[in-house]
Regions:
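Glycine-biased low-complexity/repetitive sequence motifs
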Residues: 2-167
Length: 167
């Protein structure tokens, strides 16, 4: 859950967001982006770093943490085909860090083949994976008398939130 957008932010808030479950003392230098608590983003990760506003060095202030969160988020704003989350998140797919997929209303993620899932949550994913679907996820339809394809294939644990109107 993102930190507040304004007002007071405490060191305990930082620890709760970026070191969940920890009761250890806080060293502010651990909270630089690309430090030990706020992971770097791999070059082949197509998602948005939810803590991109946090500096990697130099002066750091609690206000740098406004509206930041622990994790990477990829938002579908246009239709897409044959999506594999290991490709979306690149080398960060195997990193123990939260990952979020958002499919906006009116957007369709679909398959072009009955042998390929529209959205593949491939094996090897680490950290929590949450998919919030306000659009559509469709497998490829089969030919007459034949089976259709898979819409969502989960080989790694994930949470799917289907919002009202989603398919």
């Amino acid at each position: 859950m993102a930190l507040a957008a304004s007002g007071a932010i405490s060191f305990a808030n930082l620890r709760d967001e970026f070191s969940p479950g920890s009761n250890t003392s806080i060293s502010f230098s651990d909270y630089y982006r690309q430090g030990s608590k706020v992971k770097a983003k791999a070059g082949n990760n197509n998602a948005v770093h939810l803590a991109a506003a946090i500096p990697t060095s130099g002066a750091i202030d609690l206000s740098d943490f406004y509206s930041t969160a622990r994790g990477f988020q990829y938002t579908y704003t246009s239709n897409a085909t044959n999506q594999n989350l290991s490709t979306v998140f690149g080398n960060d797919y195997a990193v123990d860090y939260p990952k979020f997929i958002v499919i906006n209303a009116g957007i369709t993620v679909y398959s072009t083949s009955t042998s390929t899932a529209a959205l593949n949550i491939a094996s090897g994913g680490a950290g929590s994976i949450t998919i919030t679907n306000s659009g559509n996820i469709y497998g490829m339809g089969g030919t007459a008398g034949q089976a259709g394809g898979t819409a969502l294939l989960a080989s790694t644990s994930a949470t799917l939130v289907n919002n009202s109107g989603a398919n």
